[in-house]
């Protein structure tokens, strides 16, 4: 085989490697820091929560997301080693509980890491960095939705209230960036289930959350129960 043939083969192999790598990697534009209101989560499931919910917004997950096209998911099948997060498990159980089954927090964290966190590279380096990042955001950076609303005198009283009041309170703590809401109807009343705070792809500054498409559960009415 001549030099020309060797160059052709090397070029084809290199092109194939690039194609495989690019097809197996989905990038992301921004992050959603999603927090769920425990009582509404329990009301949304056909099987009741095993333990009474706290009247708090706690972490659902930190999700790398795209403005257009599919969001990246399941970028690894490697489960979380509980020993690697042993020193932060006490904090995680408080801010990131498995609301549906408090006997299996690790299972919930593992699902969030595999489905979402593993796709956050380079902003998220590994599983321990993923969980520590969430702790920093929720506690140190005070991206705790319950705390944000409480500072604005909006307490979880289980009453109907204007969604715009909730949005304005959150905007005041996120450099006036638009949050994302998810609602559900329960016994004819629309409950606020989730709030998402959006950040850029490097997790360094807030950004507006994209407007949800028509028919999305992320479209909430003017008044919601909280």
Swiss-Prot record:
Hydrolase as UniProt keyword: yes
Residues spanning the signal sequence: 1-27
Gene3D superfamilies in UniProt: Ribonuclease T2-like
An example molecular function term from Gene Ontology annotations: RNA binding
PROSITE patterns in the cross-refs: RNASE_T2_1
Binding-site positions, RNA: 36, 60, 98-99, 108, 111-112, 115-116
GO terms (BP aspect): RNA catabolic process
Coiled coil: none
Residues carrying a glycan: 74, 77, 126, 144, 172
GO cellular component: extracellular region
Protein task: Self-incompatibility (SI) is the inherited ability of a flowering plant to prevent self-fertilization by discriminating between self and non-self pollen during pollination. In many species, self-incompatibility is controlled by the single, multiallelic locus S.
Protein name (record): Ribonuclease S-7
């Amino acid at each position: 085989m001549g030099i020309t043939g060797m160059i052709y083969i090397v070029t084809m192999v290199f092109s194939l490697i690039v194609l495989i790598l690019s097809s197996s990697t989905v990038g992301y534009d921004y992050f959603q820091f999603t927090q769920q209101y425990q009582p509404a989560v329990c009301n949304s499931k056909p099987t009741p929560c095993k333990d009474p919910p706290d009247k708090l917004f706690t972490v659902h997950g930190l999700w790398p997301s795209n403005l257009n096209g599919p969001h990246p998911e399941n970028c690894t099948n490697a489960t979380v080693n509980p020993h690697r997060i042993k020193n932060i498990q006490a904090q995680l159980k408080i801010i990131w509980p498995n609301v549906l089954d408090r006997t299996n927090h690790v299972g919930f964290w593992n699902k969030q890491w595999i489905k979402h966190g593993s796709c956050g590279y380079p902003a998220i380096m590994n599983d321990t960095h993923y969980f520590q990042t969430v702790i920093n955001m929720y506690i140190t950076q005070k991206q705790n939705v319950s705390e944000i609303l409480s500072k604005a005198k909006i307490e979880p009283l289980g009453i109907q209230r204007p969604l715009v009041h909730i949005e304005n309170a959150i905007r005041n703590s996120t450099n006036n960036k638009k949050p994302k809401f998810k609602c559900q109807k329960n016994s004819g009343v629309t409950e606020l289930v989730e709030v998402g705070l959006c950040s850029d792809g490097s997790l360094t500054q807030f950004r507006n959350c994209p407007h949800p498409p028509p028919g999305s559960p992320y479209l909430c009415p003017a008044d919601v129960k909280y």
